[in-house]
From Swiss-Prot:
InterPro entries membership: Ribosomal_Su5_D2-typ_SF, UDP-acyl_GlcNac_deAcase, UDP-acyl_GlcNac_deAcase_C, UDP-acyl_N-AcGlcN_deAcase_N
An example Gene Ontology CC term for this record: membrane
Signal peptide range: none
Annotated binding of Zn(2+), by residue: H78, H237, D241
Protein name: UDP-3-O-acyl-N-acetylglucosamine deacetylase
A GO molecular function held by the record: UDP-3-O-acyl-N-acetylglucosamine deacetylase activity
Catalytic activity reported: a UDP-3-O-[(3R)-3-hydroxyacyl]-N-acetyl-alpha-D-glucosamine + H2O = a UDP-3-O-[(3R)-3-hydroxyacyl]-alpha-D-glucosamine + acetate
GO biological process: lipid A biosynthetic process
Amino acid sequence: MLKQRTIKSIVKTVGIGLHSGRKVELTLRPAAPGTGIVFSRVDLPTPVDIPASAMSIGDTRLASVLQKDGARVSTIEHLMSACAGLGIDNLYVDVTAEEIPIMDGSAASFVFLIQSAGIEEQNAPKRFIKVKKPVEVRDGDKFARLDPFFGFKLKFTIDFRHPAVDKTGQALEVDFANTSYVREIARARTFGFAHEVEMMRELGLARGGSMDNAIVLDEYRILNNDGLRYDDEFVKHKMLDAIGDLYVVGHPLLASYTAYKSGHGLNNALLRELLAHEDAYEIVTFDDPQAAPSGFAFDTQTAFA
């Protein structure tokens, strides 16, 4: 049986919120089979638990934001991406602010945290959402699409007319049957343009943003002294985001995802469109792990490896 997974022990870290600039304490705790990934605002007078789900995503303008009973947890996509990449099904995420800390702007810190805690298989079958029919959403020239596929692969195209981005490649296709999430995707950082950062700060946003947690570009070049971690880091980060956005559906997808200029809002709209058509998907499990797609028949250290 291909089993559900959680972490072995509690692990904690401290970082800053990308937009608030405030210190955030983050605690990851093991969770029982069938729990899913549950975020908890432990700083509130009465803590609020917000299970990750497609229907709980509210604001998507700058990040994926979970909302419930007036409580928010923002910028969940990098942590969710790490959970997807490591095959974590069940987890409690305690936070002391309304933002998940940005860390270094990628998913690498969350991968390290989860691996430090250890990964534990649980005596319950891992559940997948198998896409049975194509589903697509569009917004002008932007689109995101899911097609039936026995595994998980993504094709993402960006279109930033910028000399530094043009040189790195604007399209990427990855099949996790033969690609390691940890090695090839997790370290890709978020990016932004210097003039946009200044505008956002005037609006009280991006107060925690710096070249320690983002790739920053001016009109012509990358400003970070250390350059890029991957030759195609820009499109890889958009793929990292998409993996996290899609994982809020509650289970790993067995599907092919194709996107052009998609973002958090369109990714969430795609999940809602999928869930609105009961004939477009089914929940499946695998009694024999070897019968699962090769990207998911992993050991307890890595997924998509």
